Swiss-Prot record:
Cellular component annotations (GO), alphabetically ordered: cytoplasm; mitotic spindle; nucleotide-excision repair factor 2 complex; nucleus; XPC complex
InterPro entries found in the cross-reference section: BHD_2, DNA_repair_Rad4, DNA_repair_Rad4-like, Papain-like_cys_pep_sf, Rad4/PNGase_transGLS-fold, Rad4_beta-hairpin_dom1, Rad4_beta-hairpin_dom3, Rad4_BHD3_sf
Entry's Gene Ontology BP terms: mismatch repair; nucleotide-excision repair
A GO term, aspect molecular function: single-stranded DNA binding
Cellular compartments annotated: Nucleus
Keywords, comma-separated and alphabetical: DNA damage, DNA repair, DNA-binding, Nucleus
Naturally occurring in which organism (per UniProt): Schizosaccharomyces pombe (strain 972 / ATCC 24843) (Fission yeast)
Any Pfam family matching the protein: BHD_3
Protein name per Swiss-Prot or TrEMBL: DNA repair protein rhp41
């Protein structure tokens, strides 16, 4: 039989590959560096041992490196739980960041920014209601485009904004976005320079001061709860900051141009400072300022942008203050590419001036169910958790208006109109569709017709709705859920469990377990003298489950028949230990066992209190005796 630990029936174990470096037969040369920077560590252990030898005649340095084997760490359920909790906490922190910056955008000290906007643009943002709908819409969009062009000329991007974080790399304080207080937020606005995120927030403040209903939109760059690619993030995309390059130049120039390092270690790393994100991709927007000569590397797609309400069309219009005017109102142009390592679109929240937050992710992503696998809603509790969050920060239903109803209808239409993905990778873990190859070990397609086909290198494969997928479990698993296999029921499928073949059954092949009743005040027991009580329905007819702390002592005191209740199992170090909770007795003794259990519990608490008082008195006696001895010693011997 299979234990509860095998109920997931995963096809493969998950592992983290730690690339500790593999030797390469090629001999490489490089400028000499400080030897203290040539070692790396994982979990605090040094993985590279160096034995440098120096001959300053011709200045030659030889470094031998002893390389350990490639290490593999198994991913446990605790690791997954920790990452999920980090994901949830990071999501809440970024949401709070959005709410805070949105409040700062409404500060009165930013009202002066309106003076940079020409009068013609101000008029275009408020077209006359006497004109036709088409003209008002065109005039409003023209005003937004002019405002974007003015703001791009006025504001200079000098620092990095928020980027996609990675687990594999530590935070680099020189590369993260600016950290501002409210005073600095308002004061720095006079400089008209900073990160792209900061400039977008000032742009939202300008629109609101121009009496244009504006929402600040934030694509939350949340740490993922998945492990796939976690190590690649740490080693594949590395950068060389300015201080590291300078150290390299200084070291090589101080000794000699002929200095070199002979290494039997493959050429794969530069000396780097750990960073908070990957900055080595050429598809990012590189901006070099004239004042600081600082290279600002940002994703081509924004993390912050704004939505301005178009009264003519009664809908929100998306605007990137530092993008091209052609993307105004085109939601899908804001989604970053899947190869963009600086920006990911998982959660997109929009916040109004009144502080109400709304999830508008469906509006900006082409395939919502493709990114759903990276959201917390993919878990059974995820949707309820998100609803609980938005019940605090979302707009109450009582405050809904026509434009909210129109937007909700549009989001629902986008969700329902999404079709079958075109590639196999997107179909994996898809919440609506499934391929037979992606089924878990305990899953099978029992009934139902296919809803589509997809071409693969092995031919044509059928696509099925996920609602037709049935989960099969062993008879032992169903028994622990209070169900047994129906007589003559056929298994859903058979799987190998060691040398045996284990049949798996779906819920339709099971029925509710009916335990034997209590007869003559005798409780039915299993082979171990206990009673299985995994769910309340497994309690026998005529029995009573006493969960009080002293229930066992009370049953022994009354000298009645009882059975210890096994309510589950604790799995520790690959061994299962039954979890006992109270006793089961005849319902006839319910009142008596409750009363006796409470009395015994009270007596034990009183006895424990007496022991505590006795121990305290003994300790006080010891302390006072010691003080008396100390005083006598000082009096007699000074």
């Amino acid at each position: 039989m299979m234990s509860d630990e095998d109920n997931t029936y995963s096809d493969d174990e998950e592992w983290l590959d730690l690339d500790l470096g593999l030797p390469n037969n090629d001999i490489k040369t490089a400028p000499i560096l400080n030897s203290s920077l040539l070692s790396s560590a994982v979990h605090g252990e040094r993985l590279i041992q160096e034995r440098p030898t120096h001959d300053f005649g011709d200045v030659e340095a030889t470094v031998d490196r002893t390389v350990e084997k490639r290490s593999r760490l198994k991913i446990t359920s605790v690791d997954r739980k920790i990452r999920l909790q980090i994901h949830q906490l990071h999501l809440l922190c970024l949401t709070y960041h959005l709410c805070t910056r949105n409040t700062w955008c409404d500060d009165n000290r930013l009202n002066y920014l309106v003076k940079y906007i020409p009068p013609g643009i101000r008029v275009s943002l408020h077209p006359s209601s006497q004109k036709s709908q088409m003209i008002r819409n065109k005039t409003f969009l023209h005003g937004l485009a002019g405002l974007v062009e003015v703001w791009k000329r006025k504001y200079k991007i000098t620092t990095n904004g928020l980027r996609k974080p990675n687990y594999g790399l530590l935070q680099n304080n020189s590369l993260i976005s600016e950290s501002l207080s409210l005073e600095e937020f308002c004061k720095n606005s006079k400089l008209l320079s900073g990160s792209r995120d900061y400039g977008t927030q000032l742009f939202a403040s300008i629109l609101r001061n121009l009496n244009v209903p504006t929402r600040l939109v934030f694509s939350l760059q949340v740490l993922s709860f998945r492990f796939k690619g976690a190590i690649n993030e740490a080693s594949s995309h590395e950068i060389v900051p300015a201080w590291s390059q300078q150290m390299e130049n200084d070291s090589s120039s101080d000794i000699s141009e002929s200095a070199h390092i002979t290494s039997r270690f493959r050429k794969r790393r530069k000396i780097i400072q750990p960073s908070f994100s990957n900055l080595s991709h050429l598809d990012a927007s590189d901006i070099v300022t004239e004042d600081t000569k600082l290279k600002v590397i940002d994703s081509p797609k924004p993390v912050f942008w704004v939505e301005a309400f178009n009264k003519a069309m009664q809908k929100w219009v998306c605007v990137d203050p530092f993008g091209d005017a052609s993307v105004i109102g085109k939601y899908r142009r804001f989604e970053p590419a899947s190869s963009d390592h600086l920006n990911q679109m998982t959660y997109v929240f929009a916040i109004e001036a009144n502080g109400y937050v709304k999830d508008v992710t469906r509006k900006y992503c082409l395939h919502y169910y493709k990114i759903l696998k990276n959201r917390v809603e993919i878990f059974p509790f995820g949707k309820a958790w998100m609803n609980r969050i938005f019940s605090k920060i979302g707009k109450p239903r009582d405050f809904y208006n026509d434009m909210d109803a129109i937007e909700d209808a549009e989001l629902l239409r986008l969700e329902q109109s999404e079709g079958i993905p075109r590639n196999i990778q997107d179909l994996k873990d898809h919440p609506l569709f499934v391929l037979e190859r992606h089924l878990k070990k305990n899953q099978a397609i029992k009934t139902g017709k296919s809803c589509g086909r997809i071409n693969t290198k092995n031919g044509v494969e059928l696509v099925y709705p996920r609602k037709y997928v049935s989960n099969g479990f062993s008879a032992e698993h169903w028994y622990r859920k209070g169900r047994i296999i129906k007589p003559g029921a056929q298994p859903l499928k058979h799987v190998k469990n060691g040398d045996k073949v284990l049949p798996l059954y779906d819920e339709e092949a099971t029925q509710l377990y009916t335990p034997k009743p209590v007869v003559a005040n005798i409780v039915p027991k299993n082979a171990y003298g206990n009673i299985d009580l995994y769910v309340p329905s497994m309690l026998p007819y005529g029995a009573y489950h006493c969960r009080k702390r002293c229930a066992l002592a009370a049953a022994k005191f009354l000298e009645i028949d009882y059975a210890k209740a096994v309510v589950g199992f604790d799995f520790q170090r690959k061994y299962s230990k039954p979890k006992l909770e109270g006793v089961v007795v005849s319902k006839r003794y319910e009142e008596a066992i409750d009363l006796i259990a409470e009395e015994i519990d009270q007596e034990e608490k009183e006895a424990e209190a007496r022991n505590v008082r006795k121990t305290c008195l003994l300790l006080w006696k010891r302390l006072i005796t010691g003080l008396r001895i100390r005083q006598r010693v000082f009096e007699e011997y000074g």
